[in-house]
Amino acid sequence: MKINTPKFGLNRHDTSSVKGYAADVARAESLGWDAAFLPDSQLRRRDTYVLLYAAAIATQQIVIGPLLTNPVTRHPSVTASSISTVAEHAQARTILACGVGDTAVRLSGLKPAKINELRDSTILLKSLLTGDPVEIGSGRPSVLPFRQDVPVWLAAGGPRTLEMAGGCADGVFIRVGTNIENIRIAALNINRGAQKSGRDPAFVKLGAVFHTVFVEEEDKAITMGKSMAAGYYEYSPMLLKNLNMHWTGPHPDLLKESEGIWPDFHHHANLEESGRVVDFLAPEHARSFALIGNAKSISIQLVEIISEASVLGIEFEYIVLQPIPNPPTPDPGPDSYLERVPKEIISGVKESLKSTHLGI
């Protein structure tokens, strides 16, 4: 059986300085990471495109880009200009991933983009990045004179957003956890959106963001995984319903208020603490929404997910292994997540997939 080997990306690097970020992405490239993604969150990190430009200059092969930006805090024309400038120094290895807005929006007191707004901004971005004249109310058509060919991806989890993304994006990053049933449903929604728009679903690439609790102590890892499951329920409760899993505790908003969880169950400063708040969830909840455990355990989970998806005709272009909890900044040395994961997990996963392809 032929199984596509995905590119593995990391979305947490040293953002304590521009120089530090460039060096950290170069370090990731040298250690075998295929992609380096950067959340666009202006109250948490330095300017996204300044950091990406520095990384572009410092590297040669690694794929770079924001994951994710949004049409609320930046107008699409500003984003198109910025990502094209980055791509001048990272041609054929820059991508742009957008979403409704996460911490960038919520921590600024703004509202996430609506689905129609995200769709319209995606169409505008694609037009600007392909050099097409666009009407944006300036009196005459606008053109980006230094545009670069940068693919526009969307990040999504809900069925309506996934369907919309399949109809207009070059690729879709799904954030639906690690259970193959939710992955199957997400791919189905993307394909449906592509078909409704007259597109061939095969041309819409797929990526996945997996929260990765790379923690040796199983009980501790499960507790953090429960916080991840709660975070998914907080924003996309249908993901539990799809798996016939139940939420037996108070509403997440009530728990956040009473227990001081901020800003949500995915981003709380102490994920063991937030995980204990939802201890009514079962270990299976945690395992359905995060990769959990030591290197061997996570490697097995990844190979199973990729193989099961391939049987269903689902191939991943990218898999982003988002570290849980966030690593320290900076995170130097051989014990760091950035150095351990390629050596202890990614290399073995790629070898296993290669062996499967060769029938070994």
Regions found by a protein language model. Give the residues of each.
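An alpha-helical appendage that flanks or caps ligand/catalytic pockets
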Residues: 2, 111-143, 183, 188, ...
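Hydrophobic faces of well-ordered beta-strands that scaffold small-molecule active sites
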Residues: 6-12, 36-38, 63-67, 94-98, ...
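N-terminal beta1-alpha1-beta2 module of alpha/beta enzyme domains
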Residues: 1-68, 150, 358-360
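Alpha-helix-loop-beta-strand connector modules within alpha/beta enzyme cores
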Residues: 49-69, 73, 128, 339-355
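Glycine-rich, proline-tolerant flexible connector loops at the mouths of alpha/beta enzymes
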Residues: 35-58, 70, 102-105, 177-180, ...
